[in-house]
């Protein structure tokens, strides 16, 4: 389950107040924890987003861009001293307790691509899911063209294979020809410049005659071991994060000026464990502890008739992928 499951129970006096998650009141023995986890999966199994059967006549077409970022948690943002970066105030909705439920890339992408159903066990990520669970398939049924974009080659850890086989994303990989390489991965593979990739996305959807599209974009500029070409030492995390946040912020400003109708959803995969915690040393992600799974997810709407004014709406209660699917379904429904 990973992350802050305990935080899902708040207390009014001495009585636990539960949202949609089983209460946690028994002593933390192995038997009790396993029983709770089993009841959690049973509860999650009943949950799914209901997408409309067809689009309402007055539904506004828009582009959905889901940005899945490797190695970024709130704890990492804090450790890098970037909590007050202007990017964070650029969102309309910000999730302060979003649980990625995993500390590895493949499972994180699968969970996001299957966001329209409740959480499942790690093992079940590698079993087929019902068609209703695949967020991008739900959108395709409503006429959205699917796009797949990577800021890397997708080979490490069979990432692209898992996105296709377990995530159900069959769209062709967006053309990477001629993209500038800003970093090299620890295995020497190219990590493409994010501004260039986002511009390539804009060019691609501008050529597309369908005004409705849904893009899954996975990028890893913050991954441990990335280094600048010609330098063997791992590039400083803060330097890379500052550049990436600056680029995303500038891209948001560009979208605002364009008038294009876009819903951008940012969901990091998991943290980079920049600082250690009581469970494991920095850099280790074997245990999906809350400092790794509490990630800065956010949503920004562009081209709205009445854009959100002021500071972002902060969602402080525990959330995960189903919340993203719900918000996308509501946006689609007009």
Regions found by a protein language model. Give the residues of each.
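Active-site rim elements
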Residues: 121-126, 185-189, 234-241, 252-253, ...
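Long, structured stretches of catalytic cores involved in phosphate-ester chemistry, encompassing
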Residues: 240-251, 259, 267-268, 275, ...
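Active-site-proximal alpha/beta segments of enzymes that process anionic O-linked groups
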Residues: 3-7, 13-228, 294, 320-321, ...
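Active-site His/acidic residue clusters
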Residues: 157, 201-202, 206-246, 250, ...
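Surface-exposed helix-capping loop/turn segments at secondary-structure junctions
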Residues: 253-262, 334
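Catalytic-core regions built around general acid/base machinery
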Residues: 86-87, 135-138, 243, 247-255
């Amino acid at each position: 389950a990973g992350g802050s499951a305990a935080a899902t129970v708040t207390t009014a006096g001495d009585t636990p107040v539960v949202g949609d998650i089983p209460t946690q009141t028994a002593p933390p023995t192995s038997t009790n924890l396993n029983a709770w986890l089993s009841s959690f999966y049973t509860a999650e199994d009943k949950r799914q987003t209901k997408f409309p059967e067809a689009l309402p006549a007055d539904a506004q077409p828009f582009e959905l861009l889901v940005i899945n970022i490797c190695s970024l948690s709130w704890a990492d943002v804090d450790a890098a001293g970037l909590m007050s970066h202007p990017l964070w105030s650029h969102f309309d909705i910000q999730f302060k307790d979003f649980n990625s439920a995993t500390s590895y890339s493949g499972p994180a992408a699968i969970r996001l691509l299957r966001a329209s159903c409740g959480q499942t066990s790690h093992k079940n990520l590698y079993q087929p899911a019902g068609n209703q669970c695949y967020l991008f398939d739900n959108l395709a049924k409503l006429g959205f063209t699917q796009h797949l974009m990577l800021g890397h080659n997708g080979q490490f850890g069979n990432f692209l294979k898992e996105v296709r086989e377990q995530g159900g994303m069959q769209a062709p990989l967006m053309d990477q020809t001629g993209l500038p390489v800003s970093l090299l991965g620890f295995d020497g593979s190219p990590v493409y410049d994010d501004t260039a990739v986002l511009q390539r996305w804009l060019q691609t959807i501008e050529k597309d005659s369908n005004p409705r599209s849904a893009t899954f974009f996975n990028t890893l500029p913050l991954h441990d071991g990335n280094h600048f070409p010609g330098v063997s030492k791992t590039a400083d995390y803060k330097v890379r994060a500052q550049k990436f946040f600056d680029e995303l912020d500038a891209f948001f400003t560009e979208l605002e000026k364009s008038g294009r109708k876009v819903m951008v959803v940012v969901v990091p995969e998991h943290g980079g464990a920049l600082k250690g915690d009581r469970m494991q040393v920095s850099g280790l992600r074997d245990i999906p502890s809350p400092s790794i799974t509490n990630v800065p997810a956010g949503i920004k709407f562009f081209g709205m008739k009445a854009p959100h004014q002021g500071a972002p709406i902060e969602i402080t209660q525990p959330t995960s992928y189903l919340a993203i699917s719900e918000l996308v379904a509501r946006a689609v429904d007009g």
